[in-house]
């Protein structure tokens, strides 16, 4: 909470490997907030597409797949527990093939719009640290605090190596480069910092340093802001 006691909506965006998940999880614990990882929802949909042999390129079919699936996020101290149709797929969605699939399903505007509505429902009550790629620009454009994390490419590759099972440095470097291009150039919610976001390069910062910096930004919010619209910009 800020000084007024209001539960804030804190948006943390950035590319793969910038440290979003680790930072958001640690920050949420310190604040007593929920931590919601929007990317896990795309990973769950990608996994469902893999399991049902669905094409990543068919927008309409993917949208129907999303609508017919039960994708749930359960906040935990170390991140989110991801449930797909009642099954815990938290580990499976971290594997390389699912990560690559998530990047492909997320480019479709209709899929993103459906996901955005679900994500707004999850965070609308405040008291949430929500991380992803378009939280501050699309999901909650009027979030109380907006952070955009970035890091040097080699640092991001090293971090992803610690997260993804069955991946190599060379494969991850290529994947990150391709994903950056896809994320930044997509028509629906491209990956860009919100105009009012604080941009932090985490390349040479520890997790504690980044969390402390964000806590200072939150503390500088001197008074409660009225609950804002969740309409996209």
Task: Enumerate the language-model features and the residues they cover.
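ATP-dependent NMP and nucleoside kinases share a basic, alpha-helical "lid"
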Residues: 90-165
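Conserved lysine of the Walker
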Residues: 20
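Hydrophobic anchor at the beta1->P-loop junction of P-loop NTPases
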Residues: 10-12
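Small-molecule kinase domains that catalyze NTP-dependent phosphoryl transfer to phosphate-bearing small molecules
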Residues: 74, 119-126, 133-138, 142, ...
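Glycine-rich phosphate-binding loops of nucleotide-dependent enzymes
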Residues: 146-153, 163-164, 199, 206-221
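Hydrophobic positions on the alpha1 helix immediately C-terminal to the Walker A/P-loop
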Residues: 23
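P-loop (Walker A) phosphate-binding loop of NTP-binding proteins
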Residues: 15
């Amino acid at each position: 909470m800020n000084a007024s006691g209001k539960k804030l909506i804190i948006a943390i965006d950035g590319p793969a490997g910038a440290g979003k998940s680790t930072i958001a999880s640690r920050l949420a614990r310190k604040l007593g907030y929920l931590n919601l990882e929007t990317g896990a929802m795309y990973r769950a949909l990608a996994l469902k597409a893999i399991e049902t042999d669905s094409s990543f390129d068919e927008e309409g079919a993917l949208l129907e797949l999303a609508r017919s699936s039960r994708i749930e996020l359960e906040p935990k101290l170390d991140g989110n527990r991801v449930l797909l149709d009642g099954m815990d797929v938290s580990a499976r969605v971290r594997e390389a093939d699912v990560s690559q699939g998530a990047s492909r399903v997320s480019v479709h505007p209709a899929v993103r719009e459906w996901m955005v509505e679900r994500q707004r429902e999850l965070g609308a009550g405040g008291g949430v640290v929500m991380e992803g790629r378009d939280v501050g620009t699309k999901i909650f454009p009027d979030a109380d605090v907006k952070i955009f994390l970035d890091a040097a490419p080699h640092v991001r590759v090293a971090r992803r190596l610690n997260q993804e099972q069955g991946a190599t440095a060379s494969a991850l470097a290529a994947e990150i480069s391709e994903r950056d291009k896809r994320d930044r150039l997509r028509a629906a919610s491209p990956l860009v910092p919100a105009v009012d976001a604080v941009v932090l390069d985490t390349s040479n910062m520890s997790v504690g340093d980044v969390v402390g910096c964000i806590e200072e930004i939150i503390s500088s919010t001197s008074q409660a802001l009225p609950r804002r619209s969740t309409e996209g910009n």
